[in-house]
A protein has these predicted regions:
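Metal- or metallocofactor-binding catalytic centers and their adjacent structured scaffolds
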Residues: 1-49
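Generic secondary-structure signature for well-ordered alpha-helical cores
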Residues: 7-14, 29, 113-116, 142, ...
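Flexible, glycine/charged-enriched surface loops at secondary-structure junctions
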Residues: 15-20, 53-56, 147-151, 225-226
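Conserved beta-strand positions in the central sheet of alpha/beta enzyme cores
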Residues: 92-94, 149, 172, 196, ...
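Metal-dependent enolase-superfamily TIM-barrel catalytic cores that perform enediolate-based chemistry
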Residues: 54-167
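Conserved, mostly hydrophobic/aromatic
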Residues: 5, 37, 50, 93, ...
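Shared catalytic-loop signature of beta/alpha-barrel
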Residues: 5, 144, 155-170, 177-247
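Short beta-strand elements of ligand-binding domains
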Residues: 122-123, 173-175
Length: 247
């Protein structure tokens, strides 16, 4: 990927956002590589202006809430992991679900009992069977979950739209809206309530564009990390301070 992109990027000015974007968008897929390059070039441009990236991005607020991801595992292990994060000040937990939905529900119940003041939401990673999704969302709503991320497979477009129309729990779009093009489709179909932006794959340029699109349609938004280093997570976190990031 770099071998292809390097000669096409060399010679462009760091502030030539249209030129850089054209080069990166002409290279299909490879979202992680393009996101990293886009962010690095924004960083280079900021420093060429004598500023840091956070100054160029002009944060709209000074505090954001963080969420801690609880993986799929034994209940006691997950609870111990949650205790560690809760002790560090975390009050929002993202609970991975999908391998054993009955066990997932029991784990959510134990978490709610152990941390009644914490907010929980589930990330199903497209794992719920369409015919069972409503039943699980109703059960999770009773347990006090805030919302559910990607409950159904992305290709189940009609089922996703129908589930969102039922209004059981707010739905988060992640893999269904990986690019601005994807997001426009999902907005037209009205399949979600909250957009999960991943700067690791959308860089700064596409993250800002997608955030603006979501805001225009009255959608909420959050910023998530994805297999990043601490430095990458820091750069992603900078975008969480943008206007329109509500969750």
């Amino acid at each position: 990927g770099l071998e292809y992109l390097r000669p096409r990027l060399l010679g462009l000015e760091a502030d030539d956002q249209e030129g850089i974007r054209a080069v990166l968008e002409a290279f299909p897929f490879n979202f992680g590589l393009k996101g990293a390059l886009d962010t690095a070039l924004w960083e280079a441009w900021a420093r060429s202006e004598g500023e840091e990236l956070y100054q160029v991005l002009k944060p709209a607020k000074h505090r954001v809430r963080v969420a801690y991801i609880l993986g799929l595992g034994e209940e006691d292990e997950v609870l111990e992991d949650a205790r560690m994060a809760f002790g560090a000040g975390v009050r929002v937990f993202k609970v991975k679900v999908g391998r054993d939905l009955e066990a997932d529900t029991r784990r959510i119940l134990r978490l709610k009992e152990a941390f009644p003041e914490a907010e929980l939401y589930a990330d199903a990673n497209e794992s719920l069977p369409p015919k069972e999704a409503e039943r699980y969302l109703l059960a999770w709503k009773e347990l006090g979950l805030r919302y559910v991320e990607e409950p159904l497979p992305v290709e189940e477009v009609e089922a996703r739209r129908a589930l969102r129309e039922k209004g059981i729990l707010p739905l988060i779009a992640d893999d269904a809206a990986m690019t601005p093009k994807d997001l426009r489709r999902e907005l037209a179909l009205n399949t979600f309530d909250v957009l999960n932006l991943k700067p690791a794959r959308t860089g700064v340029t596409w993250t800002l564009e997608m955030l603006a699109l979501a805001r225009e349609r009255g959608k909420k938004a959050m910023v998530g990390s994805q297999a990043q280093s601490a430095f990458g997570a820091y750069q992603s976190a900078l975008l969480a301070f943008q206007q329109g990031v509500t969750e």
